[in-house]
Amino acid sequence: MSTLVFIEFNKNVISESSSQAATIANDLQNEVYGLTSKDDETYISSLGSKGFDKIFVIDNFNHYSAIEEIIKSNGIKTILSPSSNTFKELSSRISTQLNFPIASNVLKIEKNGKISCSIFSGKAESHMINDNDSCIYLLNKNIVESQDFDKKVDIIKVDSKVSENSSFEVLEQKLIEEDISLNDADVVISAGRGLKGPENWQMIEDLAKKLNAATACSKPVSDAGWRPHHEHVGQTGLKISPKIYFAIGISGAIQHLAGVNSSKTIIVINNDPEAPFFKAADYGIVGDAFEIVPKILNSLG
């Protein structure tokens, strides 16, 4: 039996989320296949160390028909995926076309088909039995530690060119420039409307550089155009699980908490002592961010 893992990369390095998915696939004692759009044979050939037996290389994750053919022709019944926006969209398409059920916010998969999932914005867990012979699992990050393996990987390049008769057309592609991937960052500095405007974001950028962190924002900030949409974390944005999450000037609505509540440590800075975020915080500072953040920067040198 084979398991397919969707592979994402961060600056030529396989993401930690994809490495963890490969570890889970090996724990299920299945043959582990990977799917990637990164055509770099030198690097891909090293992915045996991450637990992959075979890698399928396609031009683009938007070439759905080619991906569906890979799944059908190889008898793949189990798909493990990081919970990124790209793979959520891809998984929804595959689910519809191939009649695969989807389990989201997955915390644990057992060999007997039992699945544990995070529900109610991380406040509870649901336990289910999958009696179907196929399933797509959208995995929460950091549910296992990724492991190294001694495997040699086979590389298969798939002809996924769109035919001339296809209605599919790529109009534009934009590269998101990030110093550190938000999905894989150990430390995330996030800010909200408490910063009062985009002109005050420099101190957030400065703190992120000092701590080798990624930057993020709340939905209202993204909606207002203060920060790019790909930095939005929350129920309708990215769901992240860093080791440390700073929430600066964010009230802590349940929709935002849904995207960050699996962070190992949450530090809140807010001038409102009644801000809901303090209830979810491991550490909290009541005060003006415009006074506190510069003091933190000064203490870091």
Outline where the language-model segments fall.
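N-terminal glycine-rich FAD/FM-binding segment characteristic of electron-transfer flavoproteins
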Residues: M1-G301
